Every structure is written in C-alpha cells, then in structure tokens.
Amino acid sequence: MADEERLKEFKEANKIVFDPNTRQVWENQNRDGTKPATTFQSEEDIKRAAPESEKDTSATSGIVPTLQNIVATVTLGCRLDLKTVALHARNAEYNPKRFAAVIMRIREPKTTALIFASGKMVVTGAKSEDDSKLASRKYARIIQKIGFAAKFTDFKIQNIVGSCDVKFPIRLEGLAFSHGTFSSYEPELFPGLIYRMVKPKIVLLIFVSGKIVLTGAKQREEIYQAFEAIYPVLSEFRKM
C-alpha cells in the first residue's frame, strides 16, 4: 500500500511527464528501434540540412531534437451539440460516460481533436506548428459544415514535445546527485530521470540509454535551447 501511495504522489508531482501526449513519446523512446534524432558530421552540414527555424541550434552537440507532438487549443466561439457532431462527422466518437468530448481524427495532417460542448478544442499529434494550425482549421471547417456557427479563433500552442538520442549511456545516479535541485530520479517508479530546467522552462526525461524527451515548450526554439544547455551535463555523466 505504501508503494501505491508513493507512486500516486510521484505521478501527481510529475503530471506533465504522465500526460498522454508526453507519455506516448517517452514510451516509444524507451523501446529499441525508435527513430533517432538527426546527427550530422559537421557544423556546415547542420547549417545546410536544417530549415531556417532550426539553424544555429546545434553548434555544440551536432544533434537537432525531433519534434514529436504539438498540442494546441482553439476556441470555436459557439456551443456545440456533441451528439450531432459525432453523428454527422467521419472518424468521430462520443461516449459521454467515459469522456465529455467528441474525439475526432483526420489523416492529413495526422492528428486527433478533442471537441468540447463549450466550443473549446484541443488538437494533438501534429509534428510541426504549421501542421497543427492546418489541422485545427480543418476541424473547425468540419464543425461549420455540420451546421454550427464555428469560428477559428484564439489558436495557441500549449505544449511541444521533442526527442533525441545522444548515442551514449548516462550515469543517472551521478546526475541526480550532482543536480539534485533540478532532478527527480526514482528508478523503482519511473525508468528515467526527470530534470526540470529553469530557463528555458522545460522538463527533460533522461534515460540511461541516452534517449532524451523534452516537453513543456511553447516554441520549438525552447526545445533546441534546452537540449544544448543539457548536452554538456550529459557528456559529463557519460558512462565510460
């Protein structure tokens, strides 16, 4: 019973880690065969290969974290009859006993929307800011076609999740001891070290394998900045 209570407290303290949008990424990262971050041979290669928004972010490590999930919110500006939405929209499900929102999916961009009766909408699964906005507009248009006076307003990115692989094992015990102010490491409860960076305000999940998940960003640059800030620390605690 004590262990169950301890696990409950741990999850409560680390809600962002156990949020489904983040959890899916770290569970995939913690398996073999996951797609690693892009690694380049030189700084010039990085500058040539990275898009404009990614340039000058990897001068230290040679690694650019991959964006895995973007969570955005939209206000549709009208109340919705969720039964009507679920009845007339494709790839939509509504089970009010389980969850008080319509769950709708589209294939391009591959995303999922949670649509609430209040007219609030949460869109997850996009791999870029542009795809997130495009998907959100598509969902709003679907609601309009059903017959509601929906508008596309107040689009906001709430969370960006990224990941990468530093390609070397990390001594998590040493890292936790040396950076105890920022670190939480309970290997019996969670396989990774949870590192709460102050600036930028990002949570990093660091695994002994060298896989890293970064979450809590509002802009992609924060993902890149956080990784470049943590990389020298990870190198210091590299397993030899």
Swiss-Prot record:
It is found in: Nucleus. Residues 21-61 are annotated as: Disordered. InterPro entries: TBP (IPR000814), TBP_CS (IPR030491), TBP_dom_sf (IPR012295), TBP_eukaryotic (IPR033710). GO terms for biological process: DNA-templated transcription initiation; negative regulation of DNA-templated transcription; nucleolar large rRNA transcription by RNA polymerase I; positive regulation of transcription by RNA polymerase II; regulation of transcription by RNA polymerase III; RNA polymerase I preinitiation complex assembly; RNA polymerase II preinitiation complex assembly; RNA polymerase III preinitiation complex assembly. GO terms for molecular function: chromatin binding; disordered domain specific binding; DNA binding, bending; DNA-binding transcription factor binding; RNA polymerase I general transcription initiation factor binding; RNA polymerase II core promoter sequence-specific DNA binding; RNA polymerase II general transcription initiation factor activity; RNA polymerase II-specific DNA-binding transcription factor binding. Sequence repeats lie at residues 67-143, 157-234. Its main location: nucleus. One of its GO terms (cellular component) is transcription regulator complex. The keyword DNA-binding applies. Residues 44-57 have a biased composition (Basic and acidic residues). Coiled coil: none annotated. Keywords: DNA-binding, Nucleus, Repeat, Transcription. Belongs to the TBP family. Binds DNA as monomer. The 1.2 MDa TFIID complex is composed of TATA binding protein (TBP) and the 14 TBP-associated factors. One copy of each TAF1, TAF2, TAF3, TAF7, TAF8, TAF11, TAF13, two copies of each TAF4, TAF5, TAF6, TAF9, TAF10, TAF12, and three copies of TAF14. Interacts with TFC8. General transcription factor that functions at the core of the DNA-binding general transcription factor complex TFIID. Binding of TFIID to a promoter (with or without TATA element) is the initial step in preinitiation complex (PIC) formation. TFIID plays a key role in the regulation of gene expression by RNA polymerase II through different activities such as transcription activator interaction, core promoter recognition and selectivity, TFIIA and TFIIB interaction, chromatin modification (histone acetylation by TAF1), facilitation of DNA opening and initiation of transcription. This is TATA-box-binding protein. It comes from Saccharomyces cerevisiae (strain ATCC 204508 / S288c) (Baker's yeast).
